[in-house]
Amino acid sequence: AATGFMLSNDLLIVTGALVRRVLLEKGRAIGVAYARGGHEVIARCAGEVLLSGGAINSPQLLMLSGIGPSAHLEQTGISVRHALTGVGRNLQDHLDICTLQHSTQRVTYDRTSELKTAFDYFLRGHRGPGSSNIAEAGAFVRSSLAPDDRPDIQMHFVPAMLDDHGRNRLPGDGYTAHACFLRPRSRGRILLASADPRTDARIEANYLSDPEGFDLKMMVECAKLSRELFAQPAFDAYRGAPIHPARTDLSDTELVAFI
């Protein structure tokens, strides 16, 4: 599908570039300035400027351009071109809780090295661990706290032990259940750490900060649901000792402390 627009004569893709700011003229966006190869390049538009930097880089670029909360821009040393308090606000993110369990059988991806995975991928006709997206199964669940008939929890099953996003390699074999609350009430924000476009934006997620504490209650529900899943008969032949949390009989209070 990408060839339908990427090979168009109307499209120019510039790589190795960092957009520094949106160019404004009489309150209207007329283009962007970007850095490439140590030089600043001006790209002007005939119609519109579309920002597609996502939930973090789009508000960052707007604020670097002088569009955003006045006090924050002035504090960062950026001239206010258009005061807009909502820029960078209302950040919503899905906090994920992982439940890890040891496997009594060597059927997971924990012992698969990157090199071996690459060989297996080609030697097995593009099958095997190298063809996996790791999240082998997913589900949407409606918890007992759901206000309507829509699912409010999303789950993914991973046939490997993912501790700290996989950065911490645990010994042995195991599997992981990821669960998140789909409609969090906590709100965060994106801020500038510097007026330098090369500096990463500050992300204040403010997880579990809603005044009612509902997000935390839902994370407890996520953890309990994952344990309930691993207790099903389908896991009887594989179920080893629990890893995170270390016990399967934690009370709600203990789960709150774990979270």
What would you call each of these model-derived segments?
Residues 48-49, 55-69:
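Alpha-helical support elements that line or immediately flank enzyme active sites
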Residues 140-144, 158-163, 172-240:
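C-terminal segments that line or cap access tunnels to active or ligand-binding sites in enzymes
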Residues 18, 54-55:
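Short glycine-/small-residue-rich Rossmann-like dinucleotide-binding loops
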Residues 17, 95, 194-196:
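Short, small-residue-rich loop/turn micro-motifs
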Residues 40-42, 147-152, 187, 200:
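Short, mixed charged/polar active-site loops
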Residues 1-29, 33-37, 98-118, 246, ...:
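Conserved redox-cofactor binding core of oxidoreductases
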Residues 38-53:
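Core beta-strand elements of the Rossmann-like FAD/NAD(P) dinucleotide-binding domain
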Residues 59, 69-171, 225-237, 245-247, ...:
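Mid-to-C-terminal "cap/lid" subdomains and adjacent gly/pro-rich loops that border
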